[in-house]
């Protein structure tokens, strides 16, 4: 039977519920338990797929093609369980399901209400998402007290009553601020946050107190007294230099032992040696490189969360400190490529829309002509193809139909038909809805022998995740190949270009998929590791 840990947040948002949940899950997994994590988002969007990165940050794509919250990326980086569409749902998704049932007449003419209909659907999805896991952590987005979160909190209250206190508990994250003028931490916001929880029928069993300073024993005792929480269950979580050290920090305070005792679980001690190795390698690099990341969402780096972490993982695996220089592609267009001078490698990530595209094309040209290692991802492949077509293959007005529908050389165009991973044909056109209409999720890719990417992966067939609506125009591929561009990877049916390389270049790889979604701190990712090695070689040759 699955046990449930409901994770809530108080005082302020962005406390790190996702990291705390993932870290706790990592400890429980290290004790031999089967663990999964769900994220419940209170916003009314059906999914984050059409939301601006400035609003929401990164959209994390699962193996089965769901566009989900970036917290699912944290979950996959911390535990071995692969997330699916069942691990993330929103208020919008819940209401959509309930309204569809109402239209079908499933409620037999009854009045459809938040309680019980919405809360029942939330509970159904939680139980379904938990599956056969020993422990399911359920993170509820937002802050306790928000109107949007109330149906989710009510549903979890009901679920705890239904399964019993031996199978469910509440873990509440709060902020314990440090007041510099007084020279002490203040517990009052935490007391009020718990008071807010109790007003809606929820009593936290564990408090995780976030603070930039250490929380002394007397403050923890005071918090325990005023919140009706056992003193040893008041966990202090200071700001950490590395998020990958948090499993050790929580384990040192016995958080996993509290949970195992409460649930009556039989399992071994936690083996956190892999995490200790990750932290040690991150803290003691032997080399250093600087990589330029040229994109359009540089004001909010959460838009590139998985990518930043993937570079960090590759650095850990190569015992290399990776410094990332974040450069807005519009600035490259306005100020020139001098902004790129002094870097050891260049990465152009994915993105949507025309803004900043010409700056990315200039960036690609700079990397190609100056023999600087280049990795292009998604749009980073498309701009690489456009640049090569314009400046090497003689197609001066080459462009993507996304940005210039009238181009005489549309080297990138809308995919109207493709096969999904199961071999089923999917079709789209310009009139298709924006939400959920892309080529999404894990797809097989066949790598060409002798290519750089084939050497990185060490195998001929790989599986990577996609999120795109445009693709290299197959009709113009022969002209590009004649001009020296190498197609190094094809889709499973051989119809779509997945990877391109430039032959007379030390390391120039551009892929249509998103390898960052499969990178983890313990296992890294072969493509990013190869990229960082190329950056190291370039740095050593200067």
Swiss-Prot record:
Positions of the Glutamine amidotransferase type-1 domain: 290-541
Binding site for L-glutamine: 351, 379-382, 402, 469
Reactions catalysed according to its record: UTP + L-glutamine + ATP + H2O = CTP + L-glutamate + ADP + phosphate + 2 H(+); L-glutamine + H2O = L-glutamate + NH4(+); UTP + NH4(+) + ATP = CTP + ADP + phosphate + 2 H(+)
Single GO MF descriptor: CTP synthase activity
Family annotation (InterPro entries): Class_I_gatase-like, CTP_synthase, CTP_synthase_N, GATASE, GATase1_CTP_Synthase, P-loop_NTPase
Keyword Magnesium: yes
GO CC term (a single one): cytosol
Entry EC number(s): 6.3.4.2
Amino-acid positions noted as binding UTP in the UniProt annotation, renumbered to this chain: 13, 186-191, 222
Binding site for Mg(2+): 71, 139
Active-site residue list: 378 (nucleophile), 514, 516
Keywords for the protein's UniProt record, in alphabetical order: ATP-binding, Glutamine amidotransferase, Ligase, Magnesium, Metal-binding, Nucleotide-binding, Pyrimidine biosynthesis
Binding site for CTP: 13, 146-148, 186-191, 222
GO biological process terms, semicolon-separated: 'de novo' CTP biosynthetic process; pyrimidine nucleobase biosynthetic process
Pathway(s) this gene product operates in, as recorded in its UniProt entry: Pyrimidine metabolism; CTP biosynthesis via de novo pathway; CTP from UDP: step 2/2
Amidoligase domain: annotated segments: 1-265
Binding site residues for ATP: 14-19, 71
HAMAP family xref list: PyrG (MF_01227)
Family: Belongs to the CTP synthase family.
Known role: Catalyzes the ATP-dependent amination of UTP to CTP with either L-glutamine or ammonia as the source of nitrogen. Regulates intracellular CTP levels through interactions with the four ribonucleotide triphosphates.
Subunit structure, as described in the record: Homotetramer.
UniProt miscellaneous comment: CTPSs have evolved a hybrid strategy for distinguishing between UTP and CTP. The overlapping regions of the product feedback inhibitory and substrate sites recognize a common feature in both compounds, the triphosphate moiety. To differentiate isosteric substrate and product pyrimidine rings, an additional pocket far from the expected kinase/ligase catalytic site, specifically recognizes the cytosine and ribose portions of the product inhibitor.
PANTHER family documented for this protein: CTP SYNTHASE, CTP SYNTHASE-RELATED
Name of the protein in its database record: CTP synthase
């Amino acid at each position: 039977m699955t046990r449930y840990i409901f994770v809530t947040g108080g005082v302020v948002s962005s406390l790190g519920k996702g990291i705390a949940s993932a870290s706790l899950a990592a400890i429980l997994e290290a004790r031999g338990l089967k663990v999964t994590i769900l994220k419940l988002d209170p916003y009314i969007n059906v999914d984050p797929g059409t939301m601006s990165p400035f609003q929401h940050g990164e959209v994390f794509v699962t193996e089965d093609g769901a566009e989900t919250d970036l917290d699912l990326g944290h979950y996959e980086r911390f535990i071995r369980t692969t997330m699916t569409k069942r691990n993330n749902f929103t208020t919008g998704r819940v209401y959509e399901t309930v309204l569809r049932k109402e239209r079908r007449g499933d409620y037999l003419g009854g009045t459809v209400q938040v309680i019980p209909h919405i809360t029942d659907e939330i509970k159904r999805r939680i139980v379904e998402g938990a599956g056969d896991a020993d422990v399911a952590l359920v993170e509820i987005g937002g802050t306790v007290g928000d109107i949007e979160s109330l149906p989710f909190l009510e549903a979890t209250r009901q679920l705890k009553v239904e399964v019993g206190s031996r199978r469910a508990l509440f873990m509440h994250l709060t902020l314990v601020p440090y007041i510099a003028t007084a020279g002490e931490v203040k517990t009052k916001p935490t007391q009020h946050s718990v008071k807010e929880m109790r007003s809606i029928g929820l009593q936290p069993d564990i408090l995780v107190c976030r603070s930039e300073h250490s929380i002394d024993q007397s403050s923890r005792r005071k918090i325990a007294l005023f919140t009706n929480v056992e003193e040893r269950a008041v966990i202090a979580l200071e700001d950490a230099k590395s998020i990958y050290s948090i499993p050790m920090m929580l384990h040192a305070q016995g958080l996993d032992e509290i949970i195992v005792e409460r649930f009556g679980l039989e399992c071994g001690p936690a083996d956190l040696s892999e995490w200790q190795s990750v932290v040690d390698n991150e803290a003691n690099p032997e080399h250093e490189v600087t990589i330029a990341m040229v994109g359009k969402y540089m004001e909010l780096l959460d838009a590139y969360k998985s990518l930043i972490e993937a570079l960090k993982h590759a650095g850990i695996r190569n015992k290399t400190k990776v410094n990332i220089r974040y450069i807005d592609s519009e600035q490259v267009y306005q100020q020139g490529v001098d902004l790129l001078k002094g870097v050891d490698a260049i990465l152009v990530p994915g993105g949507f829309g025309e803004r900043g595209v010409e700056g990315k094309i200039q960036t690609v040209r700079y990397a190609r002509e100056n023999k600087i290692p280049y990795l292009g991802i998604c749009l980073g492949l498309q701009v690489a193809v456009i640049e090569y077509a314009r400046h090497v293959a003689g197609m001066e007005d080459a462009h993507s139909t996304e940005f210039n529908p009238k181009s005489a050389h549309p080297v990138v165009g809308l995919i109207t038909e493709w096969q999904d991973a199961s071999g089923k044909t999917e079709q789209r056109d310009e009139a298709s809805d924006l939400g959920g209409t892309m080529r999404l999720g894990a797809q097989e890719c066949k790598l060409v022998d002798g290519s750089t990417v084939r050497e990185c992966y060490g195998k001929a067939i790989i599986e990577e995740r996609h999120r795109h609506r445009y693709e290299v125009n197959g009709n113009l591929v022969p002209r590009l190949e004649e001009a020296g561009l190498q197609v190094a990877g094809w889709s499973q049916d051989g119809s779509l270009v997945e990877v391109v390389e430039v032959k007379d270049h030390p390391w120039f790889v551009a892929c249509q998929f998103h390898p960052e979604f499969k990178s983890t701190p313990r296992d890294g990712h072969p493509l990013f590791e190869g990229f960082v090695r190329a950056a190291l070689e370039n740095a050593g040759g200067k």
